[in-house]
From Swiss-Prot:
Biological process (GO), any one: base-excision repair
UniProt subunit comment: Monomer.
EC number annotated for this UniProt entry: 3.2.2.23, 4.2.99.18
Protein function: Involved in base excision repair of DNA damaged by oxidation or by mutagenic agents. Acts as a DNA glycosylase that recognizes and removes damaged bases. Has a preference for oxidized purines, such as 7,8-dihydro-8-oxoguanine (8-oxoG). Has AP (apurinic/apyrimidinic) lyase activity and introduces nicks in the DNA strand. Cleaves the DNA backbone by beta-delta elimination to generate a single-strand break at the site of the removed base with both 3'- and 5'-phosphates.
Organism whose genome encodes this protein: Mannheimia succiniciproducens (strain KCTC 0769BP / MBEL55E)
Gene: mutM
SUPFAM superfamilies hit by this protein: Glucocorticoid receptor-like (DNA-binding domain) (SSF57716), N-terminal domain of MutM-like DNA repair proteins (SSF81624), S13-like H2TH domain (SSF46946)
One Gene Ontology MF term: class I DNA-(apurinic or apyrimidinic site) endonuclease activity
Zinc is among the record's keywords: yes
Cofactor descriptive note: Binds 1 zinc ion per subunit.
Protein family: Belongs to the FPG family.
Pfam families: Fapy_DNA_glyco, H2TH, zf-FPG_IleRS
Protein name: Formamidopyrimidine-DNA glycosylase
Cofactor entry: Zn(2+)
Signal peptide (from-to): none
Amino acid sequence: MPELPEVETAKNGITPYLEGYLIEKIIVRQPKLRWEVSPQLAQISQQKITALSRRAKYLIIHTEQGYIIGHLGMSGSVRIVSARDPVDKHDHLDIVMNNGKIMRYNDPRRFGTWLWSANLDEFHLFLKLGPEPLSDEFNAEYLFKKSRKKQTPVKNFLMDNSVVVGVGNIYANETLFMCGLHPEKITAKLTKAQCALLVEKIKQELKRAIEQGGTTLKDFLQPDGRPGYFAQELQIYGKKGAPCPNCGTKIESLVVAQRNSYFCPKCQKK
């Protein structure tokens, strides 16, 4: 699944081809995605794109009259193509620009979506989201306060979008390893120092992933078709049975909140 760095990479990749240009039309080939594509999108014409941004794992295209909001789901991607490029069977939506470029959305599993909102402040999917992990609002004091009385595993806590957005499975695994915390550690038992370290490492890991173009998983490509390169730097995710990079102990895995979790039993004692 594309996580925050992958969505940020996608945003950065398509911005030069969209920002400041007019949308000629939006072609919706398959409206039945995770949530049905907003019917307003097919009516958009001659609207200028004024900016692109991201909230959590949502890609936001700002126009003069409202906002096109996309989520890449489990296997979705966006890329820049021209009218000459053939359409794939999983190419569900095109945003056709007046500069000859097309932003094409491909999603084999159809778990993504494209929606319309006239007002971001009232957009229902954003109302209960926590702070952005790279913002000043996400700090040690905030995380420690949120962790009090929480009896859930710390990995669940970090992946709760009402606590902080965009820390998905890959980066939760990596961060907990860097902090020496077992994924099943009870959240309420976190110390202030541990919360401070978590905040530091989450920010560090996400920034590094963004700089390197997202994580190379089987489905993720950058908008120009190149893979991300951060998977080469992952220390523990997906490496069950491999030696821990710190101590050499075999990496183990377990399921936490229906997601695979990887940890070193020596470095991350419960």
